[in-house]
């Protein structure tokens, strides 16, 4: 397929170095066969995450020099608040150190004000830290994504959509009084960075409104979702990205955002409320002891300024086209080489279907994690498992949850790697495919009780 050149000039570079096979084998063993525990200096191309790993623009770097580090009332906060109103149309802004900071101050407030005593949150698909914060409130995280998300080889425009019938049925099953919130994750990371259609967002929000349930939009990749709507959904081709974003957020009540993704900063998050003053004040109360004063929320003034600028830059259609087409290019190279992926590619990453690539490894031996290790050993490329290891155990029973997908995510940082890097990544993965049948599953030598995939240590099964 045709490659789109990078829509920027490179003003600064960071050298990276290739390591030897022996170096990588030793480094992975020392890391307990967990790519999260590798030293970055031992990684050649780092696709662990697109969160906080992007390259800021010259305007964002200039913004860092304009930091107002006042403890209260920083002008950078006022600029950020204005950007939130411009982009999302939400009145009330609470900055946080990153997305999970927004979740930890918001979710307990939503549980506290619900009428029932058996709280649940329903989402198209909770991401790992979101589900963990839900469970830390004593609530249950329930996913009702479309079944099409699990058919990785078949093209479908909206694999991130809610299954609306399941959404209605889940509300009836648990009772609306027990649903603390409906979380719309855009794009849907755990399903492969897949977009959610405007029609689906609109209908999910209408269902929530009929039942008096708060709608939270998990907004890490909201710009990418808007781009897909413009490209694929009838009636939106002539609308701007900013217009589409405004409509998406008109259907929500609250947003949480890891600003380390689409707004392209190294640190920062947002918890924003459209108009509910009581909820805003409750979130502010939790913010002070957990994140910091309400006008900095754990961020330096300079970082709020970079975030305010990034909210505008992330919505640029020319940038988004290059960004998503670069991901698509990598996906097509892999498909041409016989590697099974979640198809079509999503916005921020290529997701390799490890169930299909390593059918001999059962879910409880973590096939996608085993594949991640082999890709690192082959070429120094670091990815991350999205599957049984990430999903973890049922907190009530202690049993391993059954993951419907076993995916290796190759997340592409924004404005960092060129198309030549994409070719190298593809060649590395295709080389692993040639010896896939010899790859072994993994077992724990250390298993943390919460979010185990970050710090677990494992070993190959003999």
From Swiss-Prot:
It comes from Nitratidesulfovibrio vulgaris (strain ATCC 29579 / DSM 644 / CCUG 34227 / NCIMB 8303 / VKM B-1760 / Hildenborough). It comes from the Bacteria. Keywords: Lyase, Pyridoxal phosphate, Tryptophan catabolism. Pathway: Amino-acid degradation; L-tryptophan degradation via pyruvate pathway; indole and pyruvate from L-tryptophan: step 1/1. Its cofactor is pyridoxal 5'-phosphate. GO terms for molecular function: tryptophanase activity. This is Tryptophanase. The lineage of its organism: Bacteria, Pseudomonadati, Thermodesulfobacteriota, Desulfovibrionia, Desulfovibrionales. InterPro entries: ArAA_b-elim_lyase/Thr_aldolase, Beta-eliminating_lyase, PyrdxlP-dep_Trfase, PyrdxlP-dep_Trfase_major, PyrdxlP-dep_Trfase_small, TNase. It catalyses: L-tryptophan + H2O = indole + pyruvate + NH4(+). The modification N6-(pyridoxal phosphate)lysine is found at residue 261. The keyword Lyase applies. Its EC number is 4.1.99.1. The gene is tnaA. Gene3D superfamilies: Aspartate Aminotransferase, domain 1, Type I PLP-dependent aspartate aminotransferase-like (Major domain). It is an enzyme of class 4 (lyase). Homotetramer. Belongs to the beta-eliminating lyase family. SUPFAM superfamilies: PLP-dependent transferases.
């Amino acid at each position: 397929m045709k490659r789109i050149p990078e829509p920027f000039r490179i003003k600064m570079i960071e050298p990276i170095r290739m390591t030897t096979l022996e170096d990588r084998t030793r480094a992975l063993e020392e890391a307990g066969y967990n790519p999260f525990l590798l030293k970055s200096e031992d990684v050649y191309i780092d696709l662990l995450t697109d969160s906080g790993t992007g390259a800021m623009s010259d305007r964002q770097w200039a913004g860092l020099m304009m930091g107002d580090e006042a403890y209260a009332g920083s002008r950078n906060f006022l600029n950020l608040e204005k950007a939130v109103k411009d982009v999302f149309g939400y009145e009330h802004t609470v900055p946080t150190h990153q997305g999970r900071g927004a979740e930890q101050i918001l979710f307990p407030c939503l549980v506290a004000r619900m009428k029932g005593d058996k709280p649940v949150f329903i989402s198209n698909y909770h991401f790992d830290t979101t589900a963990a914060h839900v469970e830390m409130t004593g609530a249950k995280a329930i996913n009702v994504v479309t079944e099409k998300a699990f058919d990785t080889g078949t093209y479908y425009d909206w694999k991130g959509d809610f299954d609306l019938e399941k959404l209605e049925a889940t509300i009836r099953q648990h009772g609306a009084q027990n649903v603390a919130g409906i979380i719309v994750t855009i794009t849907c990371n755990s399903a492969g960075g897949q977009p959610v259609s405007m029609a689906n967002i609109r209908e999910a929000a209408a269902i929530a409104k009929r039942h008096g349930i708060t709608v939270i939009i998990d907004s890490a990749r909201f710009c990418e979702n808007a781009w897909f709507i413009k490209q694929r959904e009838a009636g939106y081709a002539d609308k701007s990205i900013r217009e589409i974003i405004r409509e998406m957020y008109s259907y929500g009540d609250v947003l949480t955002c890891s600003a380390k993704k689409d707004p392209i900063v190294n640190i920062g998050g947002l918890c924003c409320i459209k108009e509910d003053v009581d909820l805003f004040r409750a979130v502010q109360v939790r913010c002070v002891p957990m994140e910091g004063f309400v006008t900095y929320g754990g961020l330096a003034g300079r970082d709020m300024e970079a975030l305010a600028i990034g909210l505008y830059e992330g919505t640029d259609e020319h940038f988004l086209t290059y960004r998503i087409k670069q991901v698509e290019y990598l996906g097509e190279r892999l498909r041409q080489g016989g590697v099974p992926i979640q198809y079509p590619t999503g916005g921020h990453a290529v997701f390799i279907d490890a169930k299909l690539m390593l059918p001999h490894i059962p879910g409880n031996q973590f096939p996608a994690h085993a594949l991640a290790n082999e890709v690192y050993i082959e070429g120094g490329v670091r990815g991350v498992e999205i599957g049984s290891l990430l999903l973890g155990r049922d907190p009530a029973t202690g049993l391993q949850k059954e993951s419907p997908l076993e995916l290796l995510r190759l997340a592409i940082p924004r404005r960092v790697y060129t198309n030549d890097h994409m070719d190298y990544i593809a060649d590395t993965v295709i080389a692993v495919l040639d010896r896939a049948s010899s790859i072994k599953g993994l077992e724990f030598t250390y298993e943390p009780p919460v979010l185990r995939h970050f710090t677990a240590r494992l070993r190959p099964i003999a």
